[in-house]
């Protein structure tokens, strides 16, 4: 760690939020630990925080800090060790006709329309289905680190947008939204495979997938990518099979 990075880390403070209803496990209360101030968290510091289990939502860098629950497990894919299974290989082949490009963080009405459609279809009543353009921008387009949008199209039609952070040692998959009526392309799976390939091309070691939660269907799918590493007891280790 450089003297500059050491100084920045020393300048970071942490506070715990008040309890709030958990978004993933019904009936439970959650808390978060938030790193502040946001302006002190540059790419190097953020990369260190991600390795400690933190994530980003807009300008907020946080990790779970619940009183009586440790269900949220940070996970990452080691790029050089990852081997797609048969289903994932089929998804990759099916997506061969899609074009993808990196874009800067900027408002695009077509992206926002897809985001709204995705939220209202997949997560109706989940708190984000009525996000207006400002709320969308605060969540997707505000960042103090090296962030880009990955845009995916098929025959010119917008199919998916993914918000990705570049870290010192990998890519962090922050948020992805896609055509909710396309049930054939397995767009979410394709996105993970694409990010693995991008990380490999960039010479990066990991793709950070956020939190794995065994009892939450929309988060448990991550264990389908192997070998998957999890942060447990302050150490990254391979998640057992099964």
UniProtKB/Swiss-Prot annotation:
Cellular component GO terms, alphabetical: cytoplasm
Alphabetized GO MF terms: arginyl-tRNA--protein transferase activity; leucyl-tRNA--protein transferase activity
GO biological process, one term: ubiquitin-dependent protein catabolic process via the N-end rule pathway
Localization per Swiss-Prot or TrEMBL: Cytoplasm
Keyword entries, A-Z: Acyltransferase, Cytoplasm, Transferase
InterPro entries membership: Acyl_CoA_acyltransferase, Asp_Glu_LeuTrfase, N-end_Aminoacyl_Trfase, N-end_Aminoacyl_Trfase_C, N-end_Aminoacyl_Trfase_N
EC number(s) from the headed UniProt entry: 2.3.2.29
Pfam families: ATE_C, ATE_N
Reactions listed under catalytic activity: N-terminal L-glutamyl-[protein] + L-leucyl-tRNA(Leu) = N-terminal L-leucyl-L-glutamyl-[protein] + tRNA(Leu) + H(+); N-terminal L-aspartyl-[protein] + L-leucyl-tRNA(Leu) = N-terminal L-leucyl-L-aspartyl-[protein] + tRNA(Leu) + H(+)
Known function: Functions in the N-end rule pathway of protein degradation where it conjugates Leu from its aminoacyl-tRNA to the N-termini of proteins containing an N-terminal aspartate or glutamate.
Descriptive protein name: Aspartate/glutamate leucyltransferase
Organism whose genome encodes this protein: Chromobacterium violaceum (strain ATCC 12472 / DSM 30191 / JCM 1249 / CCUG 213 / NBRC 12614 / NCIMB 9131 / NCTC 9757 / MK)
Phylogenetic classification of the source organism: Bacteria, Pseudomonadati, Pseudomonadota, Betaproteobacteria, Neisseriales
């Amino acid at each position: 760690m450089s003297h500059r990075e050491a100084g920045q880390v020393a300048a970071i403070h942490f506070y715990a939020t008040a309890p709030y209803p958990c978004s993933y496990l019904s009936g439970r209360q959650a808390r978060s630990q938030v790193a502040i101030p946001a302006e002190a968290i540059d790419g190097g510091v953020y990369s260190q925080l991600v390795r400690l289990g933190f994530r980003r939502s807009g300008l907020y860098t946080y990790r779970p800090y619940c009183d009586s629950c440790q269900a949220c497990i940070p996970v990452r894919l080691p790029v050089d060790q990852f081997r797609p299974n048969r289903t994932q290989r089929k998804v990759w082949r099916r997506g061969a006709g899609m074009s993808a490009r990196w874009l800067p963080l900027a408002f695009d009405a077509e992206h926002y329309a897809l985001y709204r459609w995705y939220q209202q279809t997949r997560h109706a009543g989940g708190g984000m289905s009525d996000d207006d353009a400002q709320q969308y921008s605060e969540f997707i387009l505000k960042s103090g680190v090296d962030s880009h949008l990955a845009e995916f199209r098929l025959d010119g039609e917008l199919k998916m947008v993914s918000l990705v952070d570049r870290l010192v040692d990998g890519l962090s998959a922050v948020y992805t939204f896609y055509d909710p009526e396309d049930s054939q392309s397995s767009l979410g799976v394709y996105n993970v495979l694409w990010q693995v390939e991008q990380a490999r091309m960039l010479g990066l070691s990991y793709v950070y997938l956020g939190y794995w939660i065994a009892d939450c269907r929309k988060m448990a799918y991550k264990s389908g990518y192997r070998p998957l590493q999890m942060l447990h007891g302050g150490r990254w280790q391979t998640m057992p099979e099964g």
